[in-house]
């Protein structure tokens, strides 16, 4: 990342960090792959109510994901397993006539054990639609 972008990001984090949390976008095209092949990008996520309060708008560095039907699940990750196993979510979707239809978003809700290893619990949103 270029220096100016790093400074802008640091300023943004300093201003909004109490309202934002670690966020990961897992790309739809990789969600049905084994966990070690799922591709993702991490950053900071903020609930819409806070983004609206601060007048934050989508731009080249900030994306907005509108509300949509989704499977919600809490899962855990650690040093050796950063990507979730979505097989149980896929099974649920299949049993209820649903299919994944968008990038999955994960918001970190708690971190434990900050020594050599860690456990991090995530709230995952997997956008779904009825199977055609």
Model-based region annotation:
Residues 1-132:
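A solvent-exposed interaction/effector surface
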